[in-house]
């Protein structure tokens, strides 16, 4: 029996042997395609090749593409675990021809692979073709010798593939394996085609048309091939299994789950083992590709997947986090093919552990509410939609998790009511949102761009240039002129002013009008990716469309921005080298006085890590290496080692910024990134780099704040002033300051202990203090005492001391501080049957304005805002004892 890994390798090697380029799987976050949430097919990374928008140095390719289908059109999440073949994560084996071979060779390759390399019996194979595709039917007869009864014609779109409403498209031919008459189900196209007897293992797409409009389709001059074979499906067939979860790879994960959880993988929690095995793969690969759990977008889908798996772990009785313990098992099975799992191992492990810890807290609250709301519901009933929405909105309980939790009891969910509650909340939010006003002028920017075209940016080589005013906007409206003292947005045909984008703030400066007067520019924005919009105030004259002007950037501010931007690149690379390649940019701000950089990392940076990252950056700064830029196409840039941001859409050309030393044996300088911002000329121009802050901004996302150049110098001066000032106050040298502070802290802790001990003695009558007055009520010893300025946290210990002295009795101590009262009542063990400390403390709480009180029968506490009534509270407790 071949393993799943061997089946994958056989496929790839077969096509390499037949002239195909083996191409690595693209990330699950599609590069350069923000229209897709996740990569869901092998052809995604070749989409632009098929459309002709991109060329590759090969015309044939083969891949094993990692895919996720969970959300949107392709959503298998709800079925995972309950069926034999649904997955959120799967591998798609594929071979592709870009205008090279077509139907006959594609069919020949497919037939030879499955019958010779995989040795599947020919008499158990059948195919489908589109009704209109007689070419394919004839080729299956010619190449494979298939009789007509095993070539099934399908008239529906199941056998016709299209990239979208327009673009490349064509008929499909699917290959099916027959498990035999002992398995229920009919052939494709029959009434019972959804049975398990006939299983699709490969889909061949013949891209031979281009859809121009709904009604117009023309032949492509260079038809292409796109095929997809589900690795898990073909592995099940080759290993003699009817269920994808029984193949060796999935079984290894399921056994690891059972071992870690102490459960039977084939027992009552069989479905849960399958869910966790599938979702573990999705979660780990998504994290490795830069997605982190959050409440929106891809991060929200990841969180749903993770929490569904964690819910099933809870159902299996797992008290402690489970999923992070399974990462080594996944790495053993898949890291050889996908080394990113090893590179991101620390991030994956920490993210899973942190998310599961948080989820368990949420789950306990949510399940308690769910149990309360469904206590009277029986099988066949439905949970009201507003209740399901409350679980989601208040407790973070996704709808699918609620449905999953109720499924074993046969209880449904009113999804229409849930959707209505969601819609009401969104409408309320929309009505309460006043907005920034930008939406009111968006049409204006489109109109200007269509009329005057894009602004030409001159700022990479100049900070002072001539230009012409081509448009003016005042209060969201296009105008022909603007008088002095008017706030205005100015668009020119060309400008050296950088418009805010990529995290870098826009330039400031002046627009000096040829006819006198100027615009003091406080900021520059970039609209629609094309217009550089100078925002400022007109001074000294009227500005008019058509005027010539001189555009002068504030060079001191620009230099500070360039310094911080270049330092951000060096910081990014230093973090990846020191913390791991899982570190990716999650956000940034480049300002004149600081930089802010958000990264994917599961835990705080230690002081040692911060120091070594600073040292790495400053080492590159001291090297004073040249910072270079180069214009390249995106694929060439990435192949050359440039870092690109996941999901970022790049044009046909990108700007590659390289900086730092080229170390011996390295094929690139220290940092190489795709970037459109402005940068220093040499690393030495940055001056000095200092990290001034590090903290969390979201789960798995850390924020680093740093300064460079003059800002770094000013920060160090300020820190030096603080240290010198503190040393003067304590009358020590700066070098002796840490020791002096530690001595003061030690003295404070000692004095706090002494004070607490003195208060305790005061309450109990020790240390020369008068013994507490003991009164007997109904044969029970009673001590009630008012204490001034005693911390509430000390009262319990004092009550315990008095209880010990009494041996048997009831104690009530009230501390009054800042006008507020804190009350603690204690009852010795022998009297708990007669008196309840909770009832007694509640009797006294009312007098001091408290609401209730709580604790145990032997010790309870309460508080209230009216410390002046402390005596009345003690009297109320005495009355309760006497009653």
From Swiss-Prot:
Reactions mediated catalytically = tRNA(Ala) + L-alanine + ATP = L-alanyl-tRNA(Ala) + AMP + diphosphate
Compartmental location: Cytoplasm
What SUPFAM superfamilies does UniProt report for this protein, alphabetically? Class II aaRS and biotin synthetases, Putative anticodon-binding domain of alanyl-tRNA synthetase (AlaRS), ThrRS/AlaRS common domain, Translation proteins
What top-level class of enzyme does the UniProt entry assign? ligase
Quote a single Gene Ontology cellular component term.
cytosol
- Per UniProt, Zn(2+) binds at 565, 569, 675, 679
Which terms are listed as keywords in the entry? Aminoacyl-tRNA synthetase, ATP-binding, Cytoplasm, Ligase, Metal-binding, Nucleotide-binding, Protein biosynthesis, RNA-binding, tRNA-binding, Zinc
Q: What is its main location?
A: cytoplasm
Annotated GO MF terms: alanine-tRNA ligase activity; aminoacyl-tRNA deacylase activity; ATP binding; tRNA binding; zinc ion binding
Instruction: Report the function annotation for this chain.
Output: Catalyzes the attachment of alanine to tRNA(Ala) in a two-step reaction: alanine is first activated by ATP to form Ala-AMP and then transferred to the acceptor end of tRNA(Ala). Also edits incorrectly charged Ser-tRNA(Ala) and Gly-tRNA(Ala) via its editing domain.
To which protein family does this belong? Belongs to the class-II aminoacyl-tRNA synthetase family.
- Domain remarks: Consists of three domains; the N-terminal catalytic domain, the editing domain and the C-terminal C-Ala domain. The editing domain removes incorrectly charged amino acids, while the C-Ala domain, along with tRNA(Ala), serves as a bridge to cooperatively bring together the editing and aminoacylation centers thus stimulating deacylation of misacylated tRNAs.
Name recorded for this polypeptide = Alanine--tRNA ligase
